[in-house]
Design a protein with these regions (language model features):
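Auxiliary Fe-S-binding modules of radical SAM enzymes
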Residues: 1-23, 201-203, 207-307
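Conserved, mostly hydrophobic/aromatic
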Residues: 35, 43, 59, 79, ...
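Catalytic cores of alpha/beta
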Residues: 124-126, 184-202
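Canonical Radical SAM [4Fe-4S] cluster-binding loop centered on the CxxxCxxC motif
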Residues: 15-61
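Conserved strand-turn element in the central/C-terminal portion of the radical SAM core barrel
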Residues: 116, 140, 144-148, 168-192, ...
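Conserved SAM/AdoMet-binding glycine-rich loop
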Residues: 67-170, 250
Length: 307
């Protein structure tokens, strides 16, 4: 038998190509392939992947293979690809039932989800999925600014973002939202920060995870940058934007800068740690004016997108 990644049979186990950093130690289970939307102008993750929902028996076969390898040692599972909540509720419940039957010590099952899908899905369906054992949703907000959401072709309005978050929390999910620092470029950082804070304040998610935007080849925003239509924000602008975002937030969320490409390792519980994180940003802004080495380090970090 040919063994591939993690010792599983290379010819049949279907690994999700992406997962959140917080799921580094989780078993990866692919329920869908690609992205059903796949139009966001900043993203090239699934541009070459045709979206499809995997057959239930294929998924169960992967679960059985993982059980053969790991036995009862699996404690967390991440479901990929980009939006497993688009799967019919009864099918997703069967997948979750199979996971918990196979791994008796399973404590957490998480998944990417799209806000538009969550906003449309009936609350009763979300409650069934939560009761079956899906515990946390990772959702890309990117920005709460209405105009920017249109520009980056996110396919959801601020109101739909809020509806998705509130409904998911009501169903009992932990809700983890992702914000793209710098997605407004050099010119729109203030409206990006304020609009994003406004949406986050209405949702009050469990986790706010920030990522520094880096234009990806084969994406429309990369082409816009190459043609001079999008101006990458400076490290100072990214830091000022982050500071303004924190100042405008009135939530009870974990604020996490948990990716190596981010300029500062900001981690804290809001509101208690807000001033501590703002102080870190102020110190970094002062340092940029005094230390060329710090600027070089920050510029380098923005290029570390594949870790």
């Amino acid at each position: 038998m040919t063994l591939g990644r993690f010792g599983l049979r290379r010819r049949s186990y279907d690994f999700p190509p992406f997962r959140p950093p917080s799921e580094a130690n989780s078993l990866l289970l692919r329920v869908t392939r690609g992205c059903p939307w796949n139009r966001c102008s900043f993203c090239s993750m699934y541009k070459t992947v045709k979206f499809e929902i995997r057959d239930l028996e294929e998924i169960k076969s992967d679960i059985e293979m993982a059980k053969e390898l790991y036995g009862d040692r699996v404690g967390t599972v991440f479901i990929g690809d980009s939006n497993s909540l688009i799967v019919k509720t009864e099918v997703l419940v069967q997948v979750l039932n199979s996971l918990y039957a196979s791994f008796p010590h399973l404590e957490r099952v998480t998944s990417y989800a799209r806000a538009k899908t969550l906003a449309k899905k009936p609350l009763v369906d979300l409650e069934k999925i939560r009761q079956a054992g899906l515990t946390r949703l990772h959702v890309g907000l990117e920005t709460g600014d209405r105009d920017l959401l249109k520009e980056i072709e996110k396919g959801a309005t601020p109101e739909e973002m809020v509806e998705a978050g509130r409904k998911s929390k009501k169903a009992g999910f932990e809700y983890s939202l992702y914000v793209l620092l710098g997605i407004g470029g050099e010119e729109k950082w203030e409206s990006h920060a304020k609009g994003t804070a406004e949406v986050l304040n209405q949702i009050d998610p469990h986790f706010i995870r920030v990522r520094t935007f880096i234009p990806q080849p084969n994406s429309p925003l990369y082409e816009a940058m190459e043609e001079g239509r999008f101006h990458m924000p400076s490290p100072e602008t990214i830091l000022k934007e982050t500071k303004l975002l924190l100042e405008e937030l009135h939530v009870n969320s974990q604020f996490l800068s948990d990716h190596i490409s981010n300029l500062l390792p900001l981690h804290g519980k809001l509101p208690g740690d807000k001033e501590k994180m703002i102080q870190m940003i102020d110190e970094a802004l002062r340092g940029l004016g005094e230390d060329d080495g710090l600027r070089e380090e920050m510029e380098m970090r923005r290029k570390l997108t594949n870790l």
